[in-house]
A protein has these predicted regions:
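Alpha-helical scaffolding within the catalytic cores
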Residues: 25-32, 211-218
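Short, well-ordered coil/turn segments that N-cap beta-strands
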Residues: 9, 41, 71-75, 131-132, ...
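Enzymes and membrane/adaptor proteins characterized by extended Gly/Ser/Thr/Asp/Glu-rich
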Residues: 16-24, 34-162, 184, 189-203, ...
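Extracellular glycoside hydrolase catalytic/binding regions
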Residues: 202-211
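Phosphate/pyrophosphate-binding betaalpha-module
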Residues: 165-166, 170-182, 212-225
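Mid-to-C-terminal alpha-helical segments outside catalytic/metal-binding sites
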Residues: 315-338
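Mature N-terminal segment immediately following signal peptide/propeptide cleavage
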Residues: 1-18
């Protein structure tokens, strides 16, 4: 792979980021040409992209073929399908699928089997449509009862319950060859603020996080999680500054990889969110995420700027090609098993 191809693999974008179209609902010649020019690592789809079963199947099948033809690897075809509040497929009413409901309800039941069944149900219909990656489960421990961001999405306030149920959802998805992304490291359940809008932080120390928020992620790592999402949450009492976890070498390289022993793929939360765009350009944020140890940059506000920014950073020595190669190796290792 050329440097340009390797860097392209580090990005997971909406189809509209590479094809000049309002809302992508098909993948034809324009998509093929765009992938040939910049073979990105994958795509993330939202409800507007998803109109009917046949339409989604055709679109994703074409994208997969273009990607394989261009670079010899499948694309990550992803969606946010947690169930309930966040369900890009089930919430539309356009698909004959079961909405499994909010994870808070399943958590309150205390029945791990329900979580496994939810994962199987979601995995079944996502796989049928052509998706191979789901931004779920939500592994956040709801330790701040005033947190409305993940209130319905979290399995609750008991780290053991969240841990067991997150794993069960992931296992259910895996039965249908759908990879899961545990989110939002280091835990969105204790935070004040909403990263979609702007700055959000936890005032916990590392020891405090280890006793609660990090437990589900430790369990995921012990069970060979392939993907963990790093959130745009600042943890000033851990890192000593306001850098979001998604851009923090302390959080990703030192803690998640070093102390917790994780060697899977780290994907950032969406880089078009306020917590990032208020502070950084698309290029700065992408470079900073990779310097921190992330592997996949999700949805930069301006993809072309972010992509060029990473290429420039390698060329001027800000990023080493070895750092790029480490991430590409992790990505390819998962893709060859898809």
């Amino acid at each position: 792979m050329s440097l340009e191809e390797k860097v392209a693999q580090l990005f997971l974008v909406q189809p509209e980021a590479i094809v000049d179209i309002g809302t992508a609902t098909a993948a034809g010649d324009a998509t093929k040409q765009a992938i040939n020019k910049t073979p990105v690592g994958g795509f993330v789809y939202f409800s507007d992209n998803l109109q009917s079963e046949q339409q989604v199947q055709d679109m994703l099948r074409n994208v997969q073929k273009y990607s394989e033809d261009r670079i010899g690897l499948p694309a990550f075809l992803s969606v946010d399908e947690e169930g309930g509040t966040v369900a890009r497929v089930a919430s539309t009413g356009r698909f004959d699928v079961t909405d499994v409901g909010d994870m808070a309800k399943i958590g309150a039941s205390g029945d791990v089997q329900q979580a496994k069944q939810a994962g199987e149900t979601i995995g079944s219909y996502l796989s049928e449509l052509g998706f191979n990656l789901d931004f779920a489960p939500d592994a956040d421990v709801l330790t701040n009862p005033d947190n409305t961001v993940v209130k319905k999405r979290s399995f609750g306030s008991d780290p053991r319950v969240v841990s067991d149920m997150s794993l069960a959802v992931a296992q259910g998805l895996a039965q249908h060859q759908v990879y899961s992304v545990y989110k939002h490291f280091p835990g969105h359940g204790a935070t004040v603020g909403d990263t979609h809008q702007g700055y959000a932080y936890t005032d916990k120390t590392l020891d405090e996080l280890k006793q609660s928020e990090l437990i589900p992620f430790e369990n995921a790592i012990q069970n060979n999680a392939a993907f963990i999402m790093a959130a745009h949450i600042s943890a000033p009492r851990v890192t000593g500054d306001d850098t979001p976890a998604s851009l923090s070498k302390t959080m990703i390289t030192d803690i998640l990889r070093g102390q917790m022993g994780y060697d899977g793929i780290v994907v950032t939360d969406a880089m078009n969110m306020g917590a990032v765009t208020e502070q950084y350009t698309s290029a700065q944020a992408a470079v900073k995420a990779l310097q921190a140890g992330a592997d996949v940059v999700l949805m930069p506000e301006d993809f072309q700027e972010a992509y060029q920014g990473v290429l420039d950073a390698v060329k001027d020595g800000t990023l080493t090609e070895q750092r790029i190669n480490e991430s590409v190796t992790r990505i390819v290792t998962v893709k060859v098993h898809m």
